[in-house]
Amino acid sequence: MDAPKKIGFDLNQIAEAFSLERVHNQPELAEWLSAHYELNTMETELFESIYTELQEDGDYWNEEELKIQFIGLAFRIAGTTVKNRIKVFYERPLSAQVNGYELAVISDCLVATPRPFHAPRNPYFFLQEFKKKRGDKKDPEAQMLTAMLIAQELNQDGLPLYGGFLFGSNWQFATLVGRKYCNSRQFDATNRDDLLQIIFVLRRLKELILNRVAQL
C-alpha cells in the first residue's frame, strides 16, 4: 500500500490535487454575508472599544495580540458560543487522509460542536490569520482551505463549510460546497461599517451551525 502523499500550503497545488473549482458567486456565501442584526448597549460599548483599539494599535499587533485583542472579543460580541452545542477553539491541530494525501494544519481559530472535555467534535468554520504577505509558506488562505478539506473528510455530511482569513486588519470570508470554492471581497476591520459586518457574519455562524446540527 502506497504511503499517503504530502502537500504544502499552496493554493494552486491544493486546487489541482483535489479538483477544486474557484467560483465567483455562491448562494451559500451570499446568504451568509447578508447577515444583519442589532447590537445591544453592552455589545455596542465593546464594539466601540475594539474599533478604537484597531484604529490606534491594530497595525502593530503581532499574531497573538491580534487574537487576544480582536478576534476573541469579536466572537464575544457576536455571541457565537452556545453551551454544550457550539464552541470557539484556538490553536487546534486537524488532520486526515483525503484522496491519498495526508493533510494536517493547526487551525488558528475554529468553531465546532464540542466534546465533553473542551475539544472540537465536528468543525464547521475556520479562521486563519497572518501578518505577512500572500505567498509566504504560512499563507492563511491555503491553511484555511486545507482545514476545510479535512473537515469534509471528518464530518462526512456533504454540507457547506465556512471560513475566513486575515491579512492584518483585512478579512475575507469563504465557503466550500463540494469541490466549489468561493471567497468574498475584503472587509477592512478599521472601517466601522466593515467591522460591524464582520461581527454580523460571525454571529450568523451560530444559526447556520444550529440548523445544521438539527439536521443530523
Model-inferred region functions:
Residues 1-76, 207-216:
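Charged, often low-complexity linker/regulatory segments
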Residues 70, 107-115, 123-134, 146-147:
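Conserved catalytic cores of phosphodiester-cleaving nucleases, focusing on short active-site segments
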Residues 78-87:
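Short secondary-structure junctions
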Residues 83, 102-106, 123-125, 142:
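Short connector loops at helix/strand junctions that flank enzyme active sites
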Residues 86-118:
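Active-site metal-binding core of divalent-cation-utilizing nuclease and nuclease-like domains
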Residues 116-122, 156-158:
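Short, solvent-exposed loop/turn segments that connect beta-strands within catalytic domains
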Residues 132-183:
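Nucleic-acid nuclease catalytic cores
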Residues 166-216:
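Short terminal or interdomain "cap/linker" segment that borders an active site or interface and mediates
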